[in-house]
Amino acid sequence: MKAQKTENGITMLQADCFNPRDILECGQIFRFDRDGEGNYRVFSLDKYAEIKKTNDGYFISTDSPDYFYDFFDLDRDYGVICEKLSSSYDVMKRAVEFGRGIRILRQNLEEMIFSFIISANNNIKRIQLIIGRICEALGEKTPFGYAFPSVKKLAEVSSPDFYFRLGAGYRAPYIYETANALKEGFELDRLKELDSVKARKALLDLKGVGAKVADCIMLFGLNRFDVFPVDTWVKKVYHRYFETGLKDSEISTFFVDTFGDLSGFAQQYLFYFLRTMDKGGKM
Protein backbone atom coordinates (compact mmCIF):
# COMPACT_ATOMS: atom_id res chain seq x y z
CA MET A 1 0.00 0.00 0.00
CA LYS A 2 1.19 3.51 -0.84
CA ALA A 3 -0.09 6.57 1.03
CA GLN A 4 0.94 10.10 0.09
CA LYS A 5 -0.09 13.27 1.91
CA THR A 6 -1.16 16.33 -0.08
CA GLU A 7 -2.40 19.77 0.98
CA ASN A 8 -6.02 18.68 0.81
CA GLY A 9 -5.85 15.03 1.77
CA ILE A 10 -4.17 11.66 1.41
CA THR A 11 -3.88 9.64 -1.79
CA MET A 12 -4.06 5.88 -1.26
CA LEU A 13 -2.68 3.62 -4.00
CA GLN A 14 -2.60 -0.20 -4.08
CA ALA A 15 -4.78 -0.15 -0.96
CA ASP A 16 -4.61 -3.87 -0.22
CA CYS A 17 -5.01 -3.43 3.55
CA PHE A 18 -7.29 -0.39 3.55
CA ASN A 19 -11.05 -0.57 3.11
CA PRO A 20 -13.23 2.13 4.72
CA ARG A 21 -16.15 -0.24 5.19
CA ASP A 22 -14.00 -2.75 7.06
CA ILE A 23 -12.28 -0.04 9.12
CA LEU A 24 -15.35 1.94 10.11
CA GLU A 25 -17.91 -0.84 10.52
CA CYS A 26 -15.88 -3.23 12.66
CA GLY A 27 -17.04 -1.70 15.95
CA GLN A 28 -14.08 0.53 16.84
CA ILE A 29 -15.56 3.94 15.95
CA PHE A 30 -19.00 5.51 16.15
CA ARG A 31 -18.66 8.98 14.63
CA PHE A 32 -18.96 8.20 10.93
CA ASP A 33 -21.61 7.94 8.26
CA ARG A 34 -21.98 7.04 4.60
CA ASP A 35 -23.46 9.28 1.92
CA GLY A 36 -25.71 8.28 -0.96
CA GLU A 37 -22.72 7.81 -3.27
CA GLY A 38 -21.01 5.34 -0.94
CA ASN A 39 -18.39 7.75 0.40
CA TYR A 40 -17.62 7.50 4.11
CA ARG A 41 -17.41 10.60 6.32
CA VAL A 42 -15.36 10.38 9.50
CA PHE A 43 -15.28 12.65 12.55
CA SER A 44 -12.64 12.71 15.31
CA LEU A 45 -12.57 15.46 17.94
CA ASP A 46 -13.04 18.58 15.76
CA LYS A 47 -11.49 16.98 12.66
CA TYR A 48 -13.29 15.69 9.55
CA ALA A 49 -12.38 13.52 6.57
CA GLU A 50 -14.24 12.08 3.60
CA ILE A 51 -13.05 8.84 1.99
CA LYS A 52 -13.71 8.52 -1.73
CA LYS A 53 -13.08 5.52 -3.99
CA THR A 54 -10.81 6.18 -6.96
CA ASN A 55 -9.82 4.08 -9.96
CA ASP A 56 -6.63 2.89 -8.28
CA GLY A 57 -7.39 3.17 -4.56
CA TYR A 58 -8.90 5.82 -2.30
CA PHE A 59 -8.59 9.52 -1.63
CA ILE A 60 -9.02 10.83 1.92
CA SER A 61 -10.23 14.40 1.51
CA THR A 62 -9.41 16.52 4.58
CA ASP A 63 -7.80 19.76 5.67
CA SER A 64 -5.99 17.76 8.39
CA PRO A 65 -3.87 15.26 6.40
CA ASP A 66 -1.21 14.86 9.11
CA TYR A 67 -3.86 14.07 11.71
CA PHE A 68 -5.65 11.48 9.58
CA TYR A 69 -2.42 9.90 8.32
CA ASP A 70 -1.72 9.05 11.95
CA PHE A 71 -5.41 8.34 12.69
CA PHE A 72 -5.55 5.61 10.03
CA ASP A 73 -2.16 4.24 11.15
CA LEU A 74 -0.84 4.45 7.59
CA ASP A 75 2.79 3.82 8.50
CA ARG A 76 2.07 0.31 9.76
CA ASP A 77 2.53 -2.69 7.44
CA TYR A 78 -0.71 -4.62 7.89
CA GLY A 79 0.37 -7.14 5.27
CA VAL A 80 2.88 -8.57 7.75
CA ILE A 81 0.22 -8.73 10.48
CA CYS A 82 -2.23 -10.49 8.15
CA GLU A 83 0.42 -13.02 7.15
CA LYS A 84 1.36 -13.85 10.74
CA LEU A 85 -2.22 -14.23 11.93
CA SER A 86 -3.30 -16.24 8.88
CA SER A 87 -0.73 -18.91 9.67
CA SER A 88 -2.16 -19.59 13.15
CA TYR A 89 -5.68 -21.05 12.79
CA ASP A 90 -7.97 -21.80 9.86
CA VAL A 91 -10.72 -19.54 11.24
CA MET A 92 -8.16 -16.78 11.73
CA LYS A 93 -7.09 -17.13 8.09
CA ARG A 94 -10.74 -16.87 6.98
CA ALA A 95 -11.32 -13.86 9.23
CA VAL A 96 -8.25 -12.05 7.88
CA GLU A 97 -9.27 -12.75 4.28
CA PHE A 98 -12.77 -11.43 5.01
CA GLY A 99 -11.68 -8.25 6.82
CA ARG A 100 -8.32 -7.66 5.19
CA GLY A 101 -9.08 -3.95 4.84
CA ILE A 102 -9.28 -3.39 8.62
CA ARG A 103 -6.88 -0.98 10.28
CA ILE A 104 -7.02 -0.20 14.00
CA LEU A 105 -7.52 3.53 14.31
CA ARG A 106 -5.39 5.75 16.54
CA GLN A 107 -8.21 7.59 18.27
CA ASN A 108 -8.32 10.22 20.99
CA LEU A 109 -8.21 8.71 24.47
CA GLU A 110 -10.83 10.97 26.05
CA GLU A 111 -13.27 10.41 23.20
CA MET A 112 -12.78 6.65 23.51
CA ILE A 113 -13.43 6.65 27.26
CA PHE A 114 -16.84 8.27 26.91
CA SER A 115 -17.75 6.49 23.67
CA PHE A 116 -17.19 3.05 25.17
CA ILE A 117 -18.90 3.91 28.45
CA ILE A 118 -21.92 4.74 26.28
CA SER A 119 -21.43 1.52 24.28
CA ALA A 120 -22.05 -0.80 27.25
CA ASN A 121 -25.11 -3.02 26.63
CA ASN A 122 -26.02 -0.87 23.66
CA ASN A 123 -26.34 -1.16 19.87
CA ILE A 124 -24.33 0.83 17.37
CA LYS A 125 -27.20 2.96 16.03
CA ARG A 126 -28.20 4.02 19.53
CA ILE A 127 -24.58 4.65 20.54
CA GLN A 128 -24.16 6.91 17.52
CA LEU A 129 -27.38 8.75 18.34
CA ILE A 130 -26.37 9.42 21.97
CA ILE A 131 -22.85 10.55 21.04
CA GLY A 132 -24.27 12.77 18.30
CA ARG A 133 -26.65 14.44 20.75
CA ILE A 134 -23.83 15.05 23.23
CA CYS A 135 -21.66 16.60 20.50
CA GLU A 136 -24.51 18.82 19.34
CA ALA A 137 -25.33 19.92 22.89
CA LEU A 138 -21.79 20.55 24.16
CA GLY A 139 -19.36 20.47 21.24
CA GLU A 140 -18.15 23.40 19.17
CA LYS A 141 -19.80 23.87 15.79
CA THR A 142 -17.51 23.22 12.82
CA PRO A 143 -18.14 23.54 9.07
CA PHE A 144 -18.85 19.79 8.99
CA GLY A 145 -20.87 19.27 12.18
CA TYR A 146 -20.11 19.34 15.88
CA ALA A 147 -16.82 18.53 17.59
CA PHE A 148 -16.56 16.03 20.41
CA PRO A 149 -16.74 18.14 23.60
CA SER A 150 -13.83 18.64 25.95
CA VAL A 151 -13.76 17.06 29.41
CA LYS A 152 -14.32 20.53 30.84
CA LYS A 153 -17.55 20.92 28.85
CA LEU A 154 -18.70 17.39 29.73
CA ALA A 155 -18.13 18.06 33.43
CA GLU A 156 -19.71 21.51 33.67
CA VAL A 157 -23.31 20.32 33.24
CA SER A 158 -25.40 20.67 36.40
CA SER A 159 -26.24 17.00 36.97
CA PRO A 160 -26.40 13.52 35.38
CA ASP A 161 -29.97 14.33 34.34
CA PHE A 162 -28.51 16.31 31.45
CA TYR A 163 -27.17 13.11 29.91
CA PHE A 164 -30.28 11.17 30.81
CA ARG A 165 -32.32 13.64 28.75
CA LEU A 166 -29.98 12.99 25.81
CA GLY A 167 -30.85 9.28 25.92
CA ALA A 168 -27.88 7.90 27.85
CA GLY A 169 -30.12 6.00 30.28
CA TYR A 170 -28.37 4.34 33.22
CA ARG A 171 -25.03 5.43 31.74
CA ALA A 172 -25.84 9.11 32.45
CA PRO A 173 -24.25 9.21 35.94
CA TYR A 174 -21.23 7.31 34.60
CA ILE A 175 -20.61 10.00 31.97
CA TYR A 176 -21.09 12.76 34.53
CA GLU A 177 -18.92 11.21 37.25
CA THR A 178 -16.14 10.17 34.88
CA ALA A 179 -16.03 13.64 33.32
CA ASN A 180 -15.62 15.14 36.77
CA ALA A 181 -12.98 12.57 37.74
CA LEU A 182 -10.93 13.46 34.65
CA LYS A 183 -11.40 17.16 35.28
CA GLU A 184 -10.32 16.84 38.91
CA GLY A 185 -7.05 15.09 38.31
CA PHE A 186 -7.32 11.55 36.95
CA GLU A 187 -4.04 11.44 35.04
CA LEU A 188 -4.71 10.24 31.51
CA ASP A 189 -1.14 10.90 30.43
CA ARG A 190 0.06 8.52 33.13
CA LEU A 191 -1.87 5.67 31.48
CA LYS A 192 0.42 5.93 28.46
CA GLU A 193 3.41 5.19 30.67
CA LEU A 194 1.90 2.17 32.46
CA ASP A 195 1.98 -1.41 31.22
CA SER A 196 -1.36 -2.84 30.10
CA VAL A 197 -2.13 -4.60 33.39
CA LYS A 198 -1.66 -1.41 35.41
CA ALA A 199 -3.41 0.76 32.81
CA ARG A 200 -6.45 -1.53 32.90
CA LYS A 201 -6.51 -1.42 36.70
CA ALA A 202 -6.44 2.39 36.62
CA LEU A 203 -9.24 2.58 34.04
CA LEU A 204 -11.41 0.28 36.15
CA ASP A 205 -11.47 3.02 38.80
CA LEU A 206 -13.60 5.15 36.45
CA LYS A 207 -17.38 4.89 36.77
CA GLY A 208 -18.95 2.81 34.01
CA VAL A 209 -15.69 1.13 33.02
CA GLY A 210 -15.72 -2.66 33.33
CA ALA A 211 -13.27 -5.18 31.89
CA LYS A 212 -14.55 -5.09 28.30
CA VAL A 213 -14.85 -1.29 28.19
CA ALA A 214 -11.36 -0.93 29.69
CA ASP A 215 -9.89 -3.24 27.04
CA CYS A 216 -11.67 -1.31 24.26
CA ILE A 217 -10.30 1.97 25.61
CA MET A 218 -6.80 0.51 25.73
CA LEU A 219 -7.01 -0.95 22.23
CA PHE A 220 -8.61 2.00 20.45
CA GLY A 221 -7.49 4.91 22.66
CA LEU A 222 -4.02 3.77 23.75
CA ASN A 223 -3.23 1.36 20.91
CA ARG A 224 -2.32 -1.44 23.29
CA PHE A 225 -2.37 -4.49 21.04
CA ASP A 226 -1.81 -6.99 23.86
CA VAL A 227 -5.48 -6.86 24.89
CA PHE A 228 -8.49 -8.79 23.60
CA PRO A 229 -11.89 -7.20 24.40
CA VAL A 230 -14.58 -9.84 24.95
CA ASP A 231 -18.25 -9.30 24.12
CA THR A 232 -21.03 -11.68 23.07
CA TRP A 233 -19.55 -12.05 19.55
CA VAL A 234 -16.10 -12.91 20.86
CA LYS A 235 -17.64 -15.44 23.24
CA LYS A 236 -19.31 -17.04 20.22
CA VAL A 237 -15.97 -17.14 18.40
CA TYR A 238 -14.33 -18.88 21.36
CA HIS A 239 -17.06 -21.44 21.94
CA ARG A 240 -17.44 -22.20 18.22
CA TYR A 241 -13.80 -22.42 17.18
CA PHE A 242 -11.50 -22.50 20.22
CA GLU A 243 -13.50 -24.27 22.95
CA THR A 244 -11.28 -25.47 25.80
CA GLY A 245 -13.82 -25.43 28.63
CA LEU A 246 -12.92 -22.02 30.04
CA LYS A 247 -15.26 -19.69 31.90
CA ASP A 248 -16.26 -16.55 30.02
CA SER A 249 -14.14 -14.49 32.42
CA GLU A 250 -11.05 -16.42 31.26
CA ILE A 251 -11.56 -16.00 27.50
CA SER A 252 -9.65 -12.72 27.17
CA THR A 253 -6.57 -14.17 28.87
CA PHE A 254 -6.78 -17.26 26.63
CA PHE A 255 -6.69 -15.15 23.47
CA VAL A 256 -3.91 -12.86 24.76
CA ASP A 257 -1.85 -15.94 25.59
CA THR A 258 -2.58 -17.27 22.09
CA PHE A 259 -1.93 -14.15 20.00
CA GLY A 260 0.39 -12.08 22.22
CA ASP A 261 1.18 -8.61 20.87
CA LEU A 262 -1.12 -9.24 17.90
CA SER A 263 -4.14 -9.88 20.15
CA GLY A 264 -5.90 -6.60 19.38
CA PHE A 265 -5.59 -7.14 15.63
CA ALA A 266 -6.83 -10.74 15.95
CA GLN A 267 -9.81 -9.55 17.98
CA GLN A 268 -10.91 -7.10 15.31
CA TYR A 269 -10.64 -9.61 12.46
CA LEU A 270 -12.50 -12.34 14.40
CA PHE A 271 -15.18 -10.00 15.78
CA TYR A 272 -15.90 -8.42 12.40
CA PHE A 273 -15.93 -11.77 10.61
CA LEU A 274 -18.34 -13.55 12.92
CA ARG A 275 -20.68 -10.62 13.49
CA THR A 276 -20.98 -9.87 9.77
CA MET A 277 -21.31 -13.47 8.64
CA ASP A 278 -23.76 -14.47 11.37
CA LYS A 279 -25.98 -11.53 10.52
CA GLY A 280 -25.74 -12.14 6.79
CA GLY A 281 -26.03 -15.89 6.58
CA LYS A 282 -24.17 -19.12 7.15
CA MET A 283 -20.39 -19.33 7.08
List each language-model region with its residue ranges.
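HhH-family (HhH-GPD) DNA N-glycosylase catalytic core used in base-excision repair
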Residues: 1-283
